[in-house]
A protein has these predicted regions:
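Sec-dependent signal peptide recognition
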Residues: 1-9
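C-terminal cap of metal-dependent C-N hydrolases
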Residues: 27, 39, 362-405
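Histidine-rich, glycine-flanked metal-binding segment
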Residues: 29, 33-72
Length: 418
């Protein structure tokens, strides 16, 4: 064992002063299927290259004493980070489209300098699954983006195609199922992407839903199982219909919200369909959610459903990091601690097959967050964040404003420029 450990570390003794090599020493490390274990982590060239009980400090000049600290994978949130700055100003909103629906990918408009990104990064978030909101039958494509400092971010897209089923449409639920069955049949059997005259497909006498070539190509990826269909649905009977539709169409499915999922938890589990949800969403905001309850998350968890958590989407992008509060409350509601933390780290990556992130393991991207205490506790603070092995700037406008207006100066606050 000593020989193997020496062989692993030998190359790093040859270059002990590499600027991008970090040794995280003595932290409580959250490991897959284990939980927190005291370990040393060696990071180099953006990757986790060693996890040991003890790594000699001489391998790197960048040693971070993590004794008593908690080290987790960076948080993966579901949000509009980098795509919305102020919800009340349309010019700062890039998640919407009137031209495209199924083929709409808002990630091309990602703004890495958004103040919301700085805030969330300082709270332990290292990446986001971007949530679209196009105006057609489909909301658009989900995509994955890291939120590191600088102009270049790693992206993975598309992850899935988002739509809704239930009360969100004026037409009958039955008609909506017929519509999607007809649309899938058209794409599967009649659509030829090589023909110029197939550039648009209009459905219905009023042409209410328009599909461009780009949209139809996105739907084709769902049919060929290159990505899942993500359905925002809440009513128990609607959930069953969506499960039945996915089985008959032979497509991969992810449920979003599922406020009445607890009523059909066994059926969701048997179908092996994951659920993305806010554990605190217990208010019957519509007739689709009359049976919403705090017990939803614990019943789904007990049934064996894979879960991923987000914080209330209506709060905008700035508060996406509060997914840790959702996870902490899920523990109080009956979800195991390890599974709750996985629901904001590894589970989003597994659900959407996001490569090399979400867990602390050798060969994975060094997206790491160091906390001063239990990461699901409300008062815990983030001390250090790594994205792709690069130590991140954790300054944010909230802290800058606090520093400005709590500093004693000769002139009143109104005279301050900085």
């Amino acid at each position: 064992m000593r020989l193997i450990r020496f062989l692993i570390l030998f190359p790093f003794f040859l270059f002990p002063h590499a600027d991008d090599m970090y040794l995280l020493k003595g932290g409580n490390v959250f490991l897959p299927n284990v939980g927190f274990v005291k370990k040393d982590i060696l990071v180099d060239e953006g990757l986790i290259i060693s996890i040991e009980d003890e790594i000699d400090s001489s391998v790197s000049e960048n040693v971070i004493n993590s004794d008593g600290k908690y080290i987790t994978p960076g948080l993966i949130v579901f949000s509009a980070l980098g795509l919305i700055e102020i919800g009340a100003l349309p010019e700062t909103i890039d998640i919407r489209s009137e031209t495209y629906n199924a083929g709409f990918d808002p990630s091309d408009a990602f703004n890495p300098f958004s103040q919301a990104i700085r805030l969330n990064r300082s709270k332990g978030v290292t990446s986001t699954v971007n949530i679209p909101s196009a105006s057609g039958y489909f909301a658009g494509l989900l995509s994955y983006t890291k939120i590191n400092n600088g102009l270049k971010q790693k992206k993975q897209a598309p992850l899935g195609l988002l739509t809704s089923y239930g009360q969100s449409y004026d037409d009958s639920r039955a008609a909506n199922l017929m519509f999607i069955e007809d649309l899938f049949s058209y794409v599967r059997n009649g659509y030829d992407s090589t023909k110029a005259d197939q550039i648009q497909f209009f459905y219905g006498t009023d042409n209410e839903y328009r599909f461009t070539k780009r949209d139809l190509e996105a739907i084709q990826k769902v049919i060929s199982k290159e990505m899942p269909l993500v359905v925002r649905v809440n009513k128990a009977t609607d959930i069953l219909k969506v499960l039945e539709m996915a089985k008959s169409e032979n497509i991969n499915l992810v449920l979003w919200e599922a406020n009445e999922g607890h009523m059909v938890a066994e059926e969701i589990s048997k179908a092996e369909v994951p659920v993305i949800m806010d554990p605190l969403n217990n208010i019957p905001g519509s007739f689709d959610s009359l049976n919403a309850t705090y017990e939803n998350v614990s019943r789904l968890h007990s049934a064996g459903v894979k879960l991923a958590f987000y914080y209330d989407q209506s709060s905008g992008a700035h508060n996406a990091y509060l997914a840790t509060q959702s996870a902490g409350n899920a523990v109080a509601l009956g979800v195991s601690y390890n599974e709750a933390l996985a629901s904001v780290t590894s589970n989003p990556a597994e659900i959407f097959d996001i490569k090399n992130v979400g867990v602390i393991a050798i060969g994975y991207d060094a997206d790491l967050t160091i906390w001063d205490n239990d990461p699901l506790e409300l008062m815990t603070q983030v001390e250090t964040v790594f994205i792709d092995g690069s130590k991140q700037d954790l300054s944010n406008r909230y802290d800058e404003l606090t520093e400005r207006y709590t500093k004693e100066e000769e002139l009143p606050n109104s005279y301050r420029s900085r």
